[in-house]
């Protein structure tokens, strides 16, 4: 270990260090005037771009439409190496990491998988920076019984290249594959059942993670939904345990991003408390700014009224060129995108104290205060969600991203009123990745095409979760666990119950919308007219202009 990972490896040269200043804690104030983030359409000739899968639309909006933009990009930490060192040695609710370490101890490090960030970061990933610093400290203490586990939960296994992108080449070469590997939720010998919570929820988790002397969790927080008590139960759990918080009854009582009103997070907290009774955990959480797009896509980081001549030219050339490209080429281009995200905070120690600070820093970057709900919510659906990195946004994942995540990007109450209408643009298709999404395709063909009744769908869940073929593909190939197909469908359940209509604009294959329970429109204006049938002739309309990811705090 010492030869491959010498002391001080976590230190980076000045040229590698990120620039600007470290964020102050969230103080409840916006860093920019809200009126710069919320605009109203004043002229019917104005046009706005909408994400449309691996492409874009250029649309007019009705006069009076409220357009909500993400906050500007916050400056990153000036000296990341120093910030990580400070976090590890000045933790919250815990002794310093160096004080927890002793020669001969057994240490397990877990890290968030490729579902974060979106898109993947330009190297170095913040998890790499944290891992290198942690491993340097372990090396200094003479600790060599170290395993590093990708906390994939029931997601598909990460490929060697995907793991290397997150952890960096030095960590990868030193530990892969014997001591750097994906969590396996179906490896019975390396899973341990710890009992039940006081609500009867099974607590089942990776054996190595709880039978070590110290578990270190390295997190990347992209939204308030993640991190905290969610990290270990989801990332290192099994179907037997995860089913308790990934089900329609719980999700119907869950605000994904507002954990104060989330039954899912209450369940995760109960499960995580049992886990923490069995192993000492040192949590390291990080946040990043919203620098989502590389230099050649910077026009997507700006509002239309801020576009330069070059931005407009670049956008329209890209939009029209993408129209004539084959789908496979468009997907390859978009999935090659690497975001220039930079770290804005790092904090370590006790799970609850750490996560409180993480959420404060997320709010500083992501929250836009908004007055009032709307009747019709417009959104452009991009090519990428948490479950299709380097893959395909199949029909099930469209439901998870639209009625699931996009609908839930709020605090307090949804941006659209109950009984309102969600309209999104996406070239809806019937494509599934042949390796990653085997259970999704079968779920779509054999369950959703027959019924959308939730009770009937839930009755199929265990069949998918225990199917030997899906289990083998999850363990030996790169397919999602069988249970994840129905789980992804459940993700949109609250919105499906809450809204009167969901309308998809310009689908490529219209009958897919019928299977999903959506209506279709050939244009955005047609969709708005269709929505008026249920919300009335003079609706309030809001265009939720994302990505970058942000949250509306609705009053």
Question: What residues fall within each predicted segment?
Answer:
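Domain-start "cap" segments at the beginnings of catalytic or binding domains
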Residues: 23-86, 311-341, 368-387, 495
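Extended hydrophobic packing segments that form well-structured cores
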Residues: 24-76, 88-89, 490-555
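Glycine-rich phosphate/diphosphate-binding loops that line cofactor/substrate pockets in enzymes
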Residues: 92-113, 140-143, 369-373, 415-417, ...
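Histidine-anchored nucleotide/phosphate-binding helix
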Residues: 118-142, 404-415, 423
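Short internal beta-strands
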Residues: 142-155, 423-426, 502-506
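Acidic low-complexity segments
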Residues: 144-196, 551-552
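Conserved, well-structured core segments that form the ligand-binding/active-site neighborhood
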Residues: 173-373, 380-383, 403-408, 414-416
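C-terminal catalytic subdomain
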Residues: 391, 397-499
């Amino acid at each position: 270990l010492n030869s491959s990972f010498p002391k001080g490896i976590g230190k980076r040269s000045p040229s590698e260090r990120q620039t600007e200043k470290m964020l102050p804690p969230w103080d409840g104030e916006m860093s920019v005037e809200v009126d710069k983030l919320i605009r109203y359409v004043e002229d019917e000739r104005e046009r706005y771009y909408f994400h449309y899968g691996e492409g874009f639309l250029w649309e007019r909006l009705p006069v009076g439409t409220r357009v909500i933009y993400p906050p500007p990009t916050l400056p990153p930490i000036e000296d990341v190496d120093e910030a990580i060192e400070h976090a590890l040695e000045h933790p919250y609710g815990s002794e310093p990491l160096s004080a927890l370490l002793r020669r001969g101890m057994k240490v397990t490090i877990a890290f968030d998988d490729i579902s974060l960030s979106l898109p993947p970061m330009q190297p170095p990933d913040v998890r790499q920076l944290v891992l290198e610093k942690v491993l340097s400290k372990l090396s200094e203490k003479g600790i060599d019984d170290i395993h590093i586990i990708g906390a994939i939960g029931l997601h598909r296994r990460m490929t060697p290249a995907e793991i290397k992108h997150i952890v960096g080449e030095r960590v990868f070469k030193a530990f892969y594959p014997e001591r750097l590997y994906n969590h396996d939720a179906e490896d019975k010998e390396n899973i341990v059942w710890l009992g039940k919570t006081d609500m009867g929820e099974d607590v089942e988790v990776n054996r190595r993670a709880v039978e070590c002397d110290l578990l270190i969790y390295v997190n990347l927080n992209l939204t308030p939904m993640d991190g905290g008590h969610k990290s270990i139960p989801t990332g290192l759990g099994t179907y037997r345990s995860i089913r308790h918080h990934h089900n329609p009854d719980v999700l119907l009582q869950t605000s994904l991003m507002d954990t104060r009103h989330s039954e899912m997070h209450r369940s995760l907290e109960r499960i995580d408390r049992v886990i923490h009774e069995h192993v000492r955990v040192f949590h390291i959480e990080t946040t990043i700014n919203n620098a989502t797009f590389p230099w050649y896509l910077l026009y997507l980081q700006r509002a239309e009224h801020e576009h330069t001549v070059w931005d407009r030219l670049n956008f329209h050339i890209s939009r029209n060129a993408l129209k004539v490209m084959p789908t496979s080429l468009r997907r390859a281009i978009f999935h090659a995108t690497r975001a220039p995200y930079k770290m804005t905070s790092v904090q370590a120690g006790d799970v609850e104290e750490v996560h409180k600070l993480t959420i404060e820093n997320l709010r500083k970057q992501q929250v836009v205060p908004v007055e009032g709900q709307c009747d019709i919510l417009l959104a452009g659906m991009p090519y990428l969600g948490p479950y299709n990195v380097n893959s395909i946004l199949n029909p099930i994942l469209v439901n998870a991203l639209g009625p699931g995540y996009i609908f839930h990007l709020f605090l307090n109450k949804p941006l659209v009123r109950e009984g309102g209408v969600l309209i999104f643009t996406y070239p809806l298709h019937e494509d599934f990745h042949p390796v990653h999404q085997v259970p999704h395709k079968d779920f779509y063909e054999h369950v959703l095409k027959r019924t959308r009744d939730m009770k009937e769908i839930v009755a199929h869940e265990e069949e998918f979760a225990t199917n030997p073929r899906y289990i083998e593909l999850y363990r030996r190939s790169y397919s999602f666990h069988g249970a994840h197909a129905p789980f992804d469908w459940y993700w949109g359940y609250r919105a499906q119950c809450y809204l009167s209509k969901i309308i998809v604009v310009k689908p490529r294959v219209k009958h897919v919308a019928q299977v999903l329970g959506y209506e279709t429109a050939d244009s955005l204006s047609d969709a708005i007219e269709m929505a008026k049938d249920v919300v009335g002739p003079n609706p309030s309309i809001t265009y939720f202009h994302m990505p970058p990811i942000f949250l509306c705090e609705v009053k």
